[in-house]
Swiss-Prot record:
One of its GO terms (cellular component) is large ribosomal subunit. Residues 202-279 are annotated as: Disordered. Belongs to the universal ribosomal protein uL2 family. One of the primary rRNA binding proteins. Required for association of the 30S and 50S subunits to form the 70S ribosome, for tRNA binding and peptide bond formation. It has been suggested to have peptidyltransferase activity; this is somewhat controversial. Makes several contacts with the 16S rRNA in the 70S ribosome. Keywords: Ribonucleoprotein, Ribosomal protein, RNA-binding, rRNA-binding. Signal peptide: none annotated. Part of the 50S ribosomal subunit. Forms a bridge to the 30S subunit in the 70S ribosome. It comes from the Bacteria. One of its GO terms (biological process) is cytoplasmic translation. Gene3D superfamilies: 2.30.30.30, Nucleic acid-binding proteins (2.40.50.140), Ribosomal protein L2, domain 3 (4.10.950.10). This is Large ribosomal subunit protein uL2. GO terms for molecular function: rRNA binding; structural constituent of ribosome; transferase activity. The gene is rplB. It holds the Pfam family Ribosomal_L2.
Amino acid sequence: MALKTFNPVTPSLRQLVIVDRSDLYKGKPLKQLTEGKSSSGGRNNNGRITVRFRGGGHKQTYRIIDFKRRKLDVAAKVERIEYDPNRTSFIALIRYADGEQSYIIAPQRLSVGDEVVSSQQADVKPGNAMPLASMPVGTIVHNIEMKIGKGGAMVRSAGTFAQVVGRDQGYVIIRLNSGEQRLIHGQCFATVGAVSNPDHMNASIGKAGRSRWLGRRPHNRGVTMNPVDHPHGGGEGRTSGGRHPVTPWGKPTKGKKTRSNKSTTKFIVTSRHKSKKKG
């Protein structure tokens, strides 16, 4: 997929750069693999805002994606590649030899008519799923499970990938895009290839209204607010906030470490922070 630019007929078109999706399927999604989805507007079950600057946006239908890929040793044919409003990557509709259909995350270099399979031992080609232990060192993978049978949790965004870099006592070492290297159990499934739509990162929204279509409301900085609304608020004229950056609730932000999950730290071989310092 390439990027699409426009003649600057209006100021917003001058800035606009979008992904050319002309090659994607243009019809509606498969009805039995969709379900309704209600917008929360950033509110929780008490009706209170838990995520700021969310709301509005176009109504979306949720596509049920098969992240587990546990239908083993049954070949499936790619029927079409589709747009999915719920994620940055594209999705592929596949039909198994027994007639069952499902959606999977579409990897790069997967085309209509290709065959994919999920197996304990499969060919190393885009779209095939297998345990990490079955993959050769150096394989590019995505949609990686963190717990056996739970379904892919990591590396699902547009253009992302991880690489198998080693093995260690039943575990496999993978290198993530962040530079982090971590141990994952060898029986956890992953899919071969990098996620589709790598040009997503180069797209430019072009105008405020397009952000609203996506359900994003205006994002206000703390220094533009009043003291009642934010610790950085107030002051005569434009001020810098007068203190280290904090959240609206006074917690340090911009670099403050917040990771509290100590139980899985042992699986991190190389921290993403240390890998960046070396580079």
